[in-house]
């Protein structure tokens, strides 16, 4: 899945960037790779976000030489597992795997649970009257700062503007990631999807 010119922020009080974002998700096991390409104060900045073999992490490098952060550990393992769950609607074949389960709450709400290597996480999907997923919310994705500290903030992934792609599948064209602070919502990722598995939005 590819995004172009995403509005992105490294933190609530951190610089805002415009990034290109490319990610690959896998269906046979919870796994994802994501690459960020941008500039920070005019200097090339790359980021790498991953969840592989039950381990998650995020690394940021400036000028291809200087490591700004390298976040790993149990909190990142769970955070990236939750991220995979939030994005699972883009990978329908993963919905049928044994590592994920669903419980319907009502006509518009489904609770989802995912497990990998003894780590479990859950969240709630909400759907509109057209059965389109509009958001995924969870209290199980801690916010890890660049210094490694963790703050427990409700997190939400939002999907919007569903359109047909060139492969005939209707998908969201807008994806946002939001921290739900008590005083305000902080959207740190606000992107338009340019393609999914090579399929582009029909014009």
Where are these regions (language model features)?
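Flexible, processing/modification-adjacent segments and terminal tails
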Residues: 61-118
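Short beta-strand segments that buttress and anchor functional surface loops
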Residues: 2-10, 32-39, 110-117, 138, ...
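Gly/Pro-enriched, hydrophobic low-complexity segments
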Residues: 113-200
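Residues that act as N-cap/strand-start positions at coil-to-secondary-structure junctions
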Residues: 13-18, 96, 106-108, 119, ...
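N-terminal mature ectodomain segment of secretory-pathway/periplasmic proteins
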Residues: 1-67
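Short, solvent-exposed coil/turn segments at beta-strand boundaries
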Residues: 21-33, 47-59, 105-108, 126-134, ...
């Amino acid at each position: 899945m590819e995004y172009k010119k995403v509005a992105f922020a490294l933190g609530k009080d951190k610089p805002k960037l415009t990034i290109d974002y490319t990610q690959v998700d896998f269906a046979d096991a919870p796994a994802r790779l994501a690459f960020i390409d941008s500039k920070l104060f005019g200097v090339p900045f790359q980021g790498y976000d991953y969840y592989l073999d039950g381990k998650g992490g995020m690394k940021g490098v400036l000028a291809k030489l200087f490591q700004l952060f390298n976040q790993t550990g149990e909190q990142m393992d769970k955070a990236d597992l939750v991220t995979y769950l939030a994005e699972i609607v883009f990978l329908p074949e993963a919905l049928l795997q044994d590592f994920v389960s669903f419980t319907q709450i009502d006509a518009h709400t489904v609770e989802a649970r995912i497990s990998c290597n003894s780590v479990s996480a859950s969240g709630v999907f909400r759907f509109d009257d057209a059965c389109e997923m509009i958001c995924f919310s969870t209290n199980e994705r801690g916010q890890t700062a660049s210094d490694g500290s963790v703050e427990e903030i409700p997190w939400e992934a939002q999907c919007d503007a569903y359109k047909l792609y060139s492969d005939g599948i209707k998908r969201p064209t807008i994806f946002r990631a939001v921290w739900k602070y008590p005083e305000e919502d902080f959207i740190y990722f606000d992107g338009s999807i340019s393609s999914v598995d090579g399929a582009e939005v029909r014009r």
